[in-house]
Structures are given as C-alpha cells and as structure tokens.
Amino acid sequence: MEPLKTHNGIAAVLNRINVDTDQIIPKQFLKRIERTGYGRFAFFDWRYLDNGDPNPDFELNRPEYKGASILIAGENFGCGSSREHAPWALDDYGFKIIIAPSFADIFHQNCFKNGMLPIRLPYEAWKELAEQYEYQSLTMTVDLEKQTITDHAGRQIAFEVDPHWKEMLLNGYDEISLTLLLEEEIEQFEKQRSSWLQA
C-alpha cells in the first residue's frame, strides 16, 4: 500500500445517517475477486437512474464534488453486513479519507486495512465541517502525522487515531507486510516452542 501521511483534496458531503455496506456497494457486484474496478458501482442505487443515467439529485453527482477524495459522511457510516468490498469501492471511487461522527466497527477497521483513513470527529466539529463543505467545491488538508484537519479557511481540527493503525498508514503497511517485518521473531518463537507442540 502507498503510505498516507498528508492528503489534500476536495471534500464531498454525504449527510445521510446509517449508510450501510449494501448501499455503498450493492450485493450484485460482489462476485468479482479483484480489488479494483468497484468504483463505478459505489452507491450504485443512489447514483444512477433506472435507465442508467447519472441521478442529478444524488449528492456525489454534483459538479462541485467532481474529483473529491475526502468524504464527509453521516453517523454510523458503513453499518450492515461485513464486506471488504465496501472500502474497495470507496477507494476505487477515489476517496482516501472518510470523516464521520461514527462508523460501524468492522467497516472502520476494514478502511485502515485497505489504506484509507476513517476519522471520527465529535458531532459539533463534524457538523461545522459538513455545513461548510455542502454544495461547495472546497479543499481541506489532512495531516496524519500531526493528526489535524485544516479546512479551506486555515482553521484546524485535531482528531484521534489508534497508534497501531496510524503506524500502518504512515508506513504503507498491510497485514502481510507487517507480518513479514516480524519474520525473524516468528522463526525464533517456532524454534523455542515446546517439543509437545511439534509433530
């Protein structure tokens, strides 16, 4: 994975509560095993009309949000069934950062595991950001090292992140690469394990 340290991009607002993983990536698109190519299916039922044309009433179809890489989402984002395809779809769509008052726990972890940064903010701080960026084409900067969000006017908001996940993102580690870093320790442990554990 690519390291994520500082990111600047357009922020799009999807102010809907309880957006579940089936709304993020509908089940009919889960048959593929590749991690790429899901972006065109993200929010499919909201994003397109029955005839396949873009839905002009869907928030993320607004021209102001073209090229957005930061998503300001509503409460309990990513709830519902556990499907890793949800962060795959969001990442392939172009989102690197998701900011919300709350996330479903499994979805929250899956974002980190797939190189995305989910940021929980207190409701009032989140609400202020959502109101600023709604229907606007404005950028913000997220600094993971300093754990700050800097809005388009230069105002900063601090956020918390688990040190383990922070290290993973800063270094571009996934679970496999992190395990490989511990290869020597794992081999030492296997050599020292009790004989009754050996076949």
Curated annotation (Swiss-Prot):
Belongs to the LeuD family. LeuD type 1 subfamily. One of its GO terms (cellular component) is 3-isopropylmalate dehydratase complex. GO terms for biological process: L-leucine biosynthetic process. This is 3-isopropylmalate dehydratase small subunit. Gene3D superfamilies: Aconitase, domain 4. One of its GO terms (molecular function) is 3-isopropylmalate dehydratase activity. It catalyses: (2R,3S)-3-isopropylmalate = (2S)-2-isopropylmalate. InterPro entries: 3-IsopropMal_deHydase_ssu (IPR004431), Aconitase/3IPM_dehydase_swvl (IPR015928), AconitaseA/IPMdHydase_ssu_swvl (IPR000573), IPMI_Swivel (IPR033940), LeuD (IPR050075). NCBIfam families: leuD (TIGR00171), PRK01641.1 (NF002458). Keywords: Amino-acid biosynthesis, Branched-chain amino acid biosynthesis, Leucine biosynthesis, Lyase. Pathway: Amino-acid biosynthesis; L-leucine biosynthesis; L-leucine from 3-methyl-2-oxobutanoate: step 2/4. Heterodimer of LeuC and LeuD. Its EC number is 4.2.1.33. Catalyzes the isomerization between 2-isopropylmalate and 3-isopropylmalate, via the formation of 2-isopropylmaleate. Signal peptide: none annotated. It holds the Pfam family Aconitase_C.
